[in-house]
Amino acid sequence: MNKKELFDAFDGFSQNLMVTLAEIEAMKKQVQSLVEENTILRLENTKLRERLSHLEHETVAKNPFKQRKDHLEGIYDEGFHICNFFYGQRRENDEECMFCRELLDRK
């Protein structure tokens, strides 16, 4: 390999390195932008979760009837009567009870 070929090879290698460096810088800027966007979205998500938690707490405080009804539905779903006639007794084969259903369907 003569000097000109060696110089041309180094020049080509140098050009390739410059192109690669430019691509890396562009990727670096893109990653930085994505990290900033991710941080903003995480903060927004945290604020929204706090707001949702606050609203849910207000809803439960304003509507204790719903909380009680949900509790009764849970007991009924576990297979127990919630009606006045058979309260606390296990339902046979998880059959529906019209008295319990009437309580759950009240508004």
UniProtKB/Swiss-Prot annotation:
Keyword Ligase assigned: no
InterPro entries: YabA (IPR010377)
Cofactor list: Zn(2+)
GO CC annotations, alphabetized: nucleoid
Keywords assigned: Cytoplasm, DNA replication, DNA replication inhibitor, Metal-binding, Zinc
Protein's cellular compartments: Cytoplasm, Nucleoid
Source organism, top-level taxon: Bacteria
UniProt entry tagged with the keyword Membrane: no
Amino-acid positions noted as binding Zn(2+) in the UniProt annotation, renumbered to this chain: 81, 83, 97, 100
Cofactor binding note: Binds 1 zinc ion per subunit.
A Pfam family: YabA
Primary localization: cytoplasm
GO biological process, one term: DNA replication
Its biological purpose: Involved in control of chromosome replication initiation. Inhibits the cooperative binding of DnaA to the oriC region, thus negatively regulating initiation of chromosome replication. Inhibits the ability of DnaA-ATP to form a helix on DNA; does not disassemble preformed DnaA-DNA helices. Decreases the residence time of DnaA on the chromosome at its binding sites (oriC, replication forks and promoter-binding sites). Tethers DnaA to the replication machinery via the DNA polymerase beta sliding clamp subunit (dnaN).
NCBIfam families tied to this protein: PRK13169.1-1 (NF009640)
Subunit structure comment from the entry: Homotetramer. Interacts with both DnaA and DnaN, acting as a bridge between these two proteins.
Family, per entry: Belongs to the YabA family.
Protein name: Replication initiation control protein YabA
Organism: Streptococcus pyogenes serotype M18 (strain MGAS8232)
Lineage, opening ranks: Bacteria, Bacillati, Bacillota, Bacilli, Lactobacillales
Designated gene of the protein: yabA
